[in-house]
Amino acid sequence: MVLIRVLANLLILQLFYAQKSSELIIGGDECNINEHRFLVALYTFRSRRLHCGGILINQEWVLSAARCNRKNIRIQLGMHSTNVINEDVQTRVPKEKFFCLSSKTHTRWNKDIMLIRLNSPVNNSTHIAPVSLPSNPPSLGSVCRVMGWGTISATKETHPDVPHCANINILDYSVCRAAYARLPATSRTLCAGILEGGKDSCKADSGGPLICNGEIQGIVSRGGHSCGQPRKPGLYTKVFDHLDWIKSIIAGNKDAICPP
């Protein structure tokens, strides 16, 4: 009888730690339905599966990553569950797309930004509203929120029906340089994650937001081959460094030059 109790307790402990390990790989929870009104989903017309995220910054413009560019992009706004459609969901397509570099020649580590002008403005609603551009760069150690419909497992491609959110920290750029040997000495890129691992953006989160104090500070760019690994934080395009370019394009200067 005692042996049975011991075995039962061991089984409970094993299940508990297995669950905690799984939580570390997943690294986040379902976003509150009202906390991501600026989060958009990028699809292609040929596929029903979203391939990237994006960020609504005003009624007519969306930010995403250059690596997310496709020929036939469809942009869904106001979505939470991919299975249950909100009444105020709106769909748009790009009218114009702007890049710091060609979407095919952006460097692996830099210039990963795309600015999309929608074919028609969207209306603010219960589940749709733009996010503020940054007034200052994020401080080292800031707790920021990353979100998206990307895969929630580091070992297999498992996409959730709803966006997941996780809190991560702004880390010193040297941490990412140590993790990625080819990362240049200077870059307009944010390094963000959890040093011990367990929370991270992952496949199909690219182009989505990194929100710090209610402002869009980063665009999900890339990370390690396996998400959420210790000392392998993610890389995020630094929005603050591209503010002049973004504002110039929106103001009508289509020849605006990105920062070097």
UniProtKB/Swiss-Prot annotation:
CC terms in the record's Gene Ontology section: extracellular region; secretory granule
Residues carrying sugar: 123-124
Cellular localisation: Secreted
Record keywords: Disulfide bond, Glycoprotein, Hemostasis impairing toxin, Hydrolase, Protease, Secreted, Serine protease, Signal, Toxin, Zymogen
Keyword Signal: yes
Tissues where this protein is expressed: Expressed by the venom gland.
Gene Ontology biological-process entries: proteolysis
Disulfide bonds: 31-165, 52-68, 100-258, 144-212, 176-191, 202-227
Propeptide: 19-24
UniProt GO molecular function: serine-type endopeptidase activity; toxin activity
Protein purpose: Snake venom serine protease that may act in the hemostasis system of the prey.
Subunit relationships: Monomer.
Stated name of the protein: Snake venom serine protease 2
